[in-house]
Amino acid sequence: MSQTAKVLLINGPNLNLLGRREPGHYGHQTLTTIVDELTRNATQAGVTLEHIQSNAEYQLIDAIHATDAQFIIINPAAFTHTSVALRDAILGVAIPFIEVHLSNVHAREPFRHHSYFSDKALGVICGLGAQGYDFALQAAIKHLSDKH
């Protein structure tokens, strides 16, 4: 795989509160800890990992429009169930992506069961906590290496 392979990691609203927000659903790890570990794993695989977390939808859309990444890992958080604009941004750049959720959204409130992203995602990982991000990164690396 090329040394220039790049993955964009997108985290949506309220994920900046990981580690203290509803740890029963989201775990005790902070977003910084998760991203640091993923960055190390990506670097070891020869992949660059870029990360954005925002509570503002437009900032996530702008990051998608501006990226030169070949793969996206996205935890849209609450935007999962509401954001046609974020979905359209990903479809507009035609970059393959995996959707990740820390909690099992299907075992939670009914409004969390619908995703505007799942039908277009290469895959969806939910309910495995922070480990889901690592599985998504492994799948992204495999996908990128298969293409080269």
UniProtKB/Swiss-Prot annotation:
UniProt protein name: 3-dehydroquinate dehydratase
SUPFAM superfamilies xrefs: Type II 3-dehydroquinate dehydratase
GO molecular function term, any single one: 3-dehydroquinate dehydratase activity
One of the GO biological process terms: quinate catabolic process
UniProt function note: Catalyzes a trans-dehydration via an enolate intermediate.
Site note Transition state stabilizer, residues: R21
Catalytic residues (UniProt): Y26, H101
Pathway: Metabolic intermediate biosynthesis; chorismate biosynthesis; chorismate from D-erythrose 4-phosphate and phosphoenolpyruvate: step 3/7
InterPro entries reported for this sequence: DHquinase_II, DHquinase_II_CS, DHquinase_II_sf
Domain of life according to the entry: Bacteria
PANTHER family on file: CATABOLIC 3-DEHYDROQUINASE
Disulfide pattern: none
Catalytic reaction annotation: 3-dehydroquinate = 3-dehydroshikimate + H2O
Keywords: Amino-acid biosynthesis, Aromatic amino acid biosynthesis, Lyase
Family: Belongs to the type-II 3-dehydroquinase family.
EC number per UniProt: 4.2.1.10
